[in-house]
Amino acid sequence: AKVIEKADLIIYAGSLVNPQVLSGAKEGAEIHNSAQMNLDEIVQMMAESAQAGKLVARVHTGDPAIYGAIAEQIQYLKSEKVPYEIIPGVSSLFASAAALEAELTQPEVSQTVIITRPAGRTPKPDREAIFRLAEHRATMCIFLGVHMIAKVVAELLTFYDPETPVAVVQKASWDDQKIVRGTLEDIADRVKD
């Protein structure tokens, strides 16, 4: 929050960023939604502003280390010799666990948490297919999967019991967060409703 309050330029990840996060921006700050920008435009704007002595805040959703697509941005800033700092955030994974009042690891249930996403526009190695990861029967936190929930459920049912408890959390930690609880057997229908 302190960086956002001082930043001259803020580039945020569109609808994924809670508007309350940006509410502390100083008057006169230049604010851009990166959803309408490509990577080259984003990194060029960041580098040019930083080189002009401006404080730049690149605001991602949750924690930038999980599906934040920051590797390319870091590489570009390094190549331009632009100093930067990565400030950790609260991942929607942990905000969801808090909203669910759930512990992700429980003795004799699961001591492992798998963080993944379904294959989509971003390719993914076959060895990381959800049905392959399901074989571990660990706690699974699946990002970006609600739009293909029936396919995700079908892959999970390869190894999980249909009565396995499941929750889908939308906009974790936001004022308008939504939680849908069910089992693997009925979650796809519950999400549709």
Where are these predicted regions, by residue range?
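Class I S-adenosyl-L-methionine
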Residues: 1-90, 95, 188
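Structural motif
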Residues: 13-14, 35-36, 118-119, 143-147
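Short secondary-structure boundary/capping segments
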Residues: 23, 48, 105-106, 131-132, ...
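Short, structurally constrained coil/turn elements
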Residues: 25, 80, 109, 160-162
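Class I SAM-dependent methyltransferase SAM-binding "motif I" and its flanking Rossmann-like core
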Residues: 5, 63-136, 178-185
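A contiguous loop/helix-start segment that scaffolds small-molecule binding in enzyme catalytic cores
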Residues: 51-56, 112, 120, 124-193
